Amino acid sequence: MTKIFAYAIREDEKPFLKEWEDAHKDVEVEYTDKLLTPETVALAKGADGVVVYQQLDYTAETLQALADNGITKMSLRNVGVDNIDMAKAKELGFQITNVPVYSPNAIAEHAAIQAARILRQDKAMDEKVARHDLRWAPTIGREVRDQVVGVIGTGHIGQVFMQIMEGFGAKVIAYDIFRNPELEKKGYYVDSLDDLYKQADVISLHVPDVPANVHMINDESIAKMKQDVVIVNVSRGPLVDTDAVIRGLDSGKIFGYAMDVYEGEVGIFNEDWEGKEFPDARLADLIARPNVLVTPHTAFYTTHAVRNMVVKAFDNNLELVEGKEAETPVKVG
């Protein structure tokens, strides 16, 4: 019987895992809540493939340990593959899949909601109400329809975000080094990032974490932006120079910042710090600000998305194990 072993299975994933198991009675499924490390590879002994999800690196040592146990089929329940030692994976003959599209709507909706909350100064108003200060001023809001929304990256998520913001009545402009022909026909694209920075009241990032994009939001780019700009990052933490954003907030140039990702988030997000010493003073400062919205990498976190991540990853792994062409293979090496 085919056997698949899954790592880092969360409670919220178990109903969808059970659903997949019930539909595949001829496949033995075992799992753990532990991450995949050299020390936990032994748990998958006898498996034909593994299904994984973690921010921790898939190191050369981890991949070697899997290969030593006869396992070279690995399916991610997420998109990102930048934490995999691809050179080692290629050397060992790994086949890897990911889930590149599990719910663009989940992430795009979150970005749109957070942008609107910043514009309406919701956090500041909520804090006032909690103090029983029910005066209106000075927390007056801005309407989405009065904004020019700049979208950097027009892939699946960026396009859904554009549709949502247009639904509010905003004017939407976009920039992408790979232009979508349909969007280009409709005249969404500006010629450069500088053009977008100069025009946009709200800027939302929807690009990958590749070297060319690291700290694309920095002192220089912020200086080119409009006064009272709103910045939204639901993509990858390293896209933003956090210190530069803090300087922009302190100067008043940036009206508000919504962040679902953070360049130092590994080991901090998805952990309970209540009653404990918080490990990152800079992040604590951002969390405390009335014009900053912090969510711990949960833009994707909906039942729809989690189901797709589990089901598609297991489907992919079974296809690899059976020698078939997987639906969403990752280029190794």
From Swiss-Prot:
Q: Which reaction equations make up its catalytic activity?
A: (R)-lactate + NAD(+) = pyruvate + NADH + H(+)
Result of changing residue 265 to Q: Decrease of activity
Outcome when changing residue 260 to N:
Decrease of activity
- Domain of life, source organism: Bacteria
**Known InterPro entries for this protein?**
D-isomer_2_OHA_DH_cat_dom, D-isomer_DH_CS, D-isomer_DH_CS1, D-isomer_DH_NAD-bd, NAD(P)-bd_dom_sf
Instruction: Specify the enzyme's EC class, one word.
Output: oxidoreductase
> What PROSITE patterns does this protein map onto?
D_2_HYDROXYACID_DH_1 (PS00065), D_2_HYDROXYACID_DH_2 (PS00670), D_2_HYDROXYACID_DH_3 (PS00671)
- This protein's UniProt keywords: NAD, Oxidoreductase
Please give the SUPFAM superfamilies that the UniProt record associates with this protein: Formate/glycerate dehydrogenase catalytic domain-like, NAD(P)-binding Rossmann-fold domains
Q: Which GO terms describe its biological process?
A: lactate metabolic process
Write down the EC number: 1.1.1.28
Q: Which residues form the active site?
A: 236, 265, 297
Per its record, what are the GO molecular function terms? Answer: D-lactate dehydrogenase activity; NAD binding
Q: Describe the family membership recorded for this protein in Swiss-Prot or TrEMBL.
A: Belongs to the D-isomer specific 2-hydroxyacid dehydrogenase family.
Q: How does it assemble?
A: Homodimer.
Protein name per Swiss-Prot or TrEMBL: D-lactate dehydrogenase
Q: What organism is recorded for this protein?
A: Lactobacillus delbrueckii subsp. bulgaricus (strain ATCC 11842 / DSM 20081 / BCRC 10696 / JCM 1002 / NBRC 13953 / NCIMB 11778 / NCTC 12712 / WDCM 00102 / Lb 14)
